């Protein structure tokens, strides 16, 4: 009673109005932040209004009439019926949030709820005891001290309980999204628990004073000391202290997106953190159920042995001393997507014809087959996997190895004799094979020279195409041309064969390319031999000559053709060789030294002045000075008389 007597003095009406005005301003800031949060997280999307009346109709009606109206109504309005809005009615609050702005009447009532919830944190009993004599002071004109009832009600509390805390100030610049989420989650957690108590308070609202109006929800009376409106959410004791508000409320985003039109604000999921951590218990909605895919014992525990099973037909065929690995082909993509009830026929591919044709103890190599359907169809757009096929006739003769059984094209098997070996199976171009003789081997198909058919089949392919360094250093004129030169694939491009394969050339083009290669080789070989004999150049230097034929003609054609009939030679050599070539005379192959030089970069001529002569009559041109003229016809140096003769031929 000492506590009651010490707090008996009540504030005046103006003080209470100023306190309510501050709370109204604070609640206005919260409404602005709440509206901003609703617009940001798409919680304003609702189903049509004709469908949502039935779900919460009873509670909406109860909250609409005589709810907390005695707190802020004036004396002249006490007998007027007045419908106020509770902050726990999310449906109507969303409707008024989407409107332009709330009316002052609707703005006041959430402040009442804020004051109600703030007072809730300090209460210890389910409801304060009504006082009969104070209840009568609301109906007659009140005495000057009639506002003492809030302090009187507060003075009846047990002095051992917690003192009331002032409301938490909320600035308008606070983060809007956490506030919006907190308000929604508070309502989702406490709406069901507060329903019965609030209905009971609303039935007796006209006969109760301020002490009876401020009701404490049963679910919110057990909160810890010092909690405010933002801290009314109960935390699990097993939860860590440093876990924020986001850790308390974990909703499945996919479930919210799917059911957003059917959800109201009350249906947001409040999940216990211990239940969520265990993955069990009474979780709301079946869509939140977590399935541990790794722990699924039905599908994930299958190993490779349960997937690869021998088919019945494969087991009957495999009795002939055949290895099981040769019969089974597992598709990895099918293995990943396999279901338990799926037939294993899609996993195992057995070639019956290969198994029937195989006798004895064949190895795994004889059973290799790509796609059987494509191999029988003989399609032209087959990839490499569909081109590897086992030849049954070659398989019967068990003396051949695996290399003899690989065929590049299925058409080649049909058009080629059965007794041919690997050289007759591998054809670069099947179309060329039908045009040429069918007994051509691989050497005549790959080579650009028809003389390559004289080469034996046992000769290696590298000896036919690659330039031999030892052959370049040798100056014997009787060497075989085919073992020395390389016909570049650009020859085929210049003659209209864009595919770059030398086997598509005609016989006339083969002859012209051969003559061009001969001329290129002899010219280069003579230079190399001269340098080796006279100047003692490095013996280990290899000069590779690549000839680009622009107009393939032999040198004996003379001057009847135009200038485009010459050759462009590219010399690949070591750095030592290039330095020596620059310091040597082009004609005499001696070091240039400090003597007078004649350098013609276009003709790649760098020689002594005494060696610079007319290439027709061998007349020396060493007396030329700067500004004098020389005549070059078909990249050949002419003196003035020789050039005059050429001009006379043109006039005639």
From Swiss-Prot:
PANTHER family linked to this entry: SCIELLIN (PTHR15468:SF7), ZNF185 (PTHR15468)
Region (15 X approximate tandem repeats): 207-496
Disulfide bonding pattern of the chain: none
Record InterPro entries: Cell_Prolif/Cornif_Regul (IPR052621), Znf_LIM (IPR001781)
GO cellular component, one term: cytoplasm
Residues with PTM Phosphoserine: 264, 343
Lineage per the UniProt record: Eukaryota, Metazoa, Chordata, Craniata, Vertebrata
CDD domains the record matches: LIM
Residues covered by the LIM zinc-binding domain: 583-649
MF GO annotations: metal ion binding
Keywords, comma-separated and alphabetical: Acetylation, Cytoplasm, LIM domain, Membrane, Metal-binding, Phosphoprotein, Repeat, Zinc
Top-rank taxon: Eukaryota
Compositionally biased spans, kind Pro residues: 161-170
Annotated region (Disordered), positions in chain: 1-29, 43-180, 353-385, 436-455
Biased composition (Low complexity): 111-130
Biological processes annotated in GO: embryo development ending in birth or egg hatching; epidermis development; keratinocyte differentiation; positive regulation of canonical Wnt signaling pathway; response to mechanical stimulus
Annotated Basic residues bias: 1-10
Source species: Mus musculus (Mouse)
Broad class of the protein's primary localization: cytoplasm
Organs and tissues of expression: Expressed in the upper layers of stratified epithelia, including, ependyma and choroid plexus of the brain ventricles.
Function: May function in the assembly or regulation of proteins in the cornified envelope. The LIM domain may be involved in homotypic or heterotypic associations and may function to localize sciellin to the cornified envelope.
Protein name, entry field: Sciellin
Residue numbers bearing the N6-acetyllysine modification: 82
């Amino acid at each position: 009673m000492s506590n009651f007597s010490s707090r008996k003095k009540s504030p005046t009406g103006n003080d209470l109005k100023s306190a309510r005005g501050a709370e109204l301003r604070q609640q206005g800031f919260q409404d602005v932040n709440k509206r901003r949060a609703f617009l940001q997280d798409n919680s304003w999307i609702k189903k049509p209004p004709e469908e949502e009346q039935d779900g919460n109709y009873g509670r909406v009606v109860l909250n609409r009439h005589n709810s907390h109206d005695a707190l802020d109504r004036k004396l002249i309005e006490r007998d007027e019926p007045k419908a106020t809005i509770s902050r726990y009615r999310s449906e109507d609050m969303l409707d008024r949030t989407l409107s332009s702005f709330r009316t002052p009447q609707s703005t006041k009532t959430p402040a009442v709820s804020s004051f109600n919830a703030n007072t809730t944190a300090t209460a210890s009993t389910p409801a304060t005891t009504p006082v009969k004599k104070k209840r009568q002071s609301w109906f007659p004109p009140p005495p000057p001290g009639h506002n003492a009832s809030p302090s009187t009600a507060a003075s009846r509390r047990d002095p051992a309980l917690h003192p009331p805390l002032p409301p938490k100030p909320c600035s308008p610049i606070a983060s809007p999204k956490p506030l919006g989420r907190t308000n929604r989650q508070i309502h989702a957690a406490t709406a069901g628990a507060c329903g019965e108590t609030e209905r009971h308070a609303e039935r007796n609202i006209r006969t109760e004073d301020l002490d009876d109006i401020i009701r404490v929800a049963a679910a919110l009376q057990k909160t810890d000391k010092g909690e405010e409106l933002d801290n009314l959410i109960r935390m699990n004791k097993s939860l860590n202290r440093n876990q924020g508000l986001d850790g308390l409320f974990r909703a499945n985003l996919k479930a919210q997106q799917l059911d957003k039109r059917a959800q109201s604000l009350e249906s947001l999921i409040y999940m216990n953190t211990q239940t969520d951590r265990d993955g069990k218990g009474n979780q709301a909605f079946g869509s939140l159920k977590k399935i541990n895919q790794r722990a699924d014992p039905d599908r994930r525990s299958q190993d490779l042995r349960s997937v690869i099973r021998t088919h019945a037909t494969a087991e009957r065929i495999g009795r002939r001393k055949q290895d099981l690995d040769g019969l089974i082909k597992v598709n990895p993509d099918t293995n990943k997507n396999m279901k338990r009830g799926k037939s294993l026929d899609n996993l195992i591919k057995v070639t019956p014809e290969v198994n029937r044709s195989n006798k004895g103890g064949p190895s795994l190599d004889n059973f290799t087959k790509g796609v059987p359907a494509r191999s029988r169809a003989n399609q032209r757009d087959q990839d490499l996997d569909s081109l590897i096929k086992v030849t049954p006739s070659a398989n019967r003769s068990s003396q051949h190895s695996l290399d003899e059984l690989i065929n590049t094209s299925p058409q080649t098997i049909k058009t080629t004799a059965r007794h041919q070996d690997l050289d007759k199976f591998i054809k670069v171009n099947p179309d060329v094979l039908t045009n040429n003789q069918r007994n051509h081997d691989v050497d005549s198909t790959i080579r650009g020279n028809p003389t390559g058919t004289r080469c034996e089949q046992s000769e290696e392919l590298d000896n036919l195409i690659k330039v031999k360094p030892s052959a370049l250093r040798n100056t014997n004129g009787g060497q075989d041309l085919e073992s020395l030169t390389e016909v570049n694939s650009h020859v085929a491009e210049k003659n209209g064969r864009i595919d770059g394969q030398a086997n598509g050339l005609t016989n006339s083009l083969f002859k012209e390319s051969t003559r061009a290669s001969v001329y290129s080789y002899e010219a280069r070989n003579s230079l190399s031999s001269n340098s080796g004999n006279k100047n003692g150049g490095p013996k280990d230097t290899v000069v590779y000559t690549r000839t680009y034929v622009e107009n393939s003609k032999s040198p004996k054609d003379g001057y009847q053709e135009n200038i485009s009939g010459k050759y462009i030679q590219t010399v690949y050599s070591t750095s030592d060789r290039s330095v020596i070539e620059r310091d040597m005379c082009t004609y005499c192959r001696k070091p240039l030294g400090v003597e007078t030089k004649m350098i013609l970069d276009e003709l790649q001529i760098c020689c002594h002045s005494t060696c610079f002569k007319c290439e027709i009559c061998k007349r020396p041109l060493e007396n030329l000075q700067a500004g004098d003229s020389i005549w070059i016809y078909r990249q050949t140096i002419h003196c003035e008389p020789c050039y005059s003769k050429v001009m006379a031929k043109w006039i005639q």
